[in-house]
Amino acid sequence: MLMDGKELARDIKVKIKAEIDNIKKIHNINPMVATILVGDDPASQVYLNSQVKSYQDLGIGVQKYFFSEEISEAYLLNLIDKLNKDTEVDGIMINLPLPPQINATKVLNSIKLIKDVDGFKAENLGLLFQNNEGFTSPSTPAGIMALIEKYNIDLEGKDVVVVGSSNIVGKPIAALILNSRGTVTICNIYTKNLAEKTKNADILISAVGKAKLITEDMVKEGAVVIDVGINRVNGKLEGDVDFENVQKKASHITPVPGGVGALTVAMLLSNILKSFKANRGII
């Protein structure tokens, strides 16, 4: 079965817009997010454009801050401090990667917890690992969990293999699965005999960024396969999974594009709504 992220993303956006419209009707205020882009990374620009269009569609105001790669860390930290103190800014979005002279961890950790719409602040990730209700999930892992829920896939007692151990996807999704009583194995580029691990997975999640890394012989019959990878090959987008062949064995599989990627912005919008309500004291 194809796991359609586009349809679910549309449904989520409709619900968010309805809630934003209702809050505006009652309180006469709209959410405001500040988005910061340093440098001219093409993938970041594409993601930013997708964000801004969604903000406009849902009635979310946006303050855009674009800087050259030469910007200093001190300047960026000073800007974030001002945005933290601005009561009319509900969320702060840092588009990664940042140039080498800027410590990304330091910058992300400088964002006020209530305004951390990306969920990358160390405090936020700590709350996630504790399964504390106060955490904000990073958007892509949240999208994966939304898809799993939509297709009624029970994680309890399942063997889940996550290929990719980044702070953005791999580690947070592993924590979310653990919180749902799944059994998680995390693999990375140093993992020996990767296929031996993946063939045991009831649910296989790949978030590496290597086209067709996951082949048919690496997948168990009837497994759920979730492809987070986005790779441009000969002008076309491909995932980490050899989709055409793996889909023959998988009970559920996400396409690229149209799977997890479609949900990343939708879940970011959900995080913005959450920060908006918390920042403005709206119950």
Swiss-Prot record:
Source organism, top-level taxon: Bacteria
Catalysis: reaction(s): (6R)-5,10-methylene-5,6,7,8-tetrahydrofolate + NADP(+) = (6R)-5,10-methenyltetrahydrofolate + NADPH; (6R)-5,10-methenyltetrahydrofolate + H2O = (6R)-10-formyltetrahydrofolate + H(+)
Keywords: Amino-acid biosynthesis, Histidine biosynthesis, Hydrolase, Methionine biosynthesis, Multifunctional enzyme, NADP, One-carbon metabolism, Oxidoreductase, Purine biosynthesis
GO molecular function: methenyltetrahydrofolate cyclohydrolase activity; methylenetetrahydrofolate dehydrogenase (NADP+) activity
CDD domains reported for this sequence: NAD_bind_m-THF_DH_Cyclohyd
A GO CC term assigned to this protein in UniProt: cytosol
Methyltransferase is among the record's keywords: no
An individual GO BP term: methionine biosynthetic process
EC number: 1.5.1.5, 3.5.4.9
InterPro entries documented for this protein: Aminoacid_DH-like_N_sf, NAD(P)-bd_dom_sf, THF_DH/CycHdrlase, THF_DH/CycHdrlase_cat_dom, THF_DH/CycHdrlase_NAD-bd_dom
Pathway: One-carbon metabolism; tetrahydrofolate interconversion
Binding site for NADP(+): 164-166, 189, 230
Pfam family, one: THF_DHG_CYH
Quaternary structure, from the entry: Homodimer.
Family: Belongs to the tetrahydrofolate dehydrogenase/cyclohydrolase family.
Role of this protein: Catalyzes the oxidation of 5,10-methylenetetrahydrofolate to 5,10-methenyltetrahydrofolate and then the hydrolysis of 5,10-methenyltetrahydrofolate to 10-formyltetrahydrofolate.
Protein name as catalogued: Bifunctional protein FolD
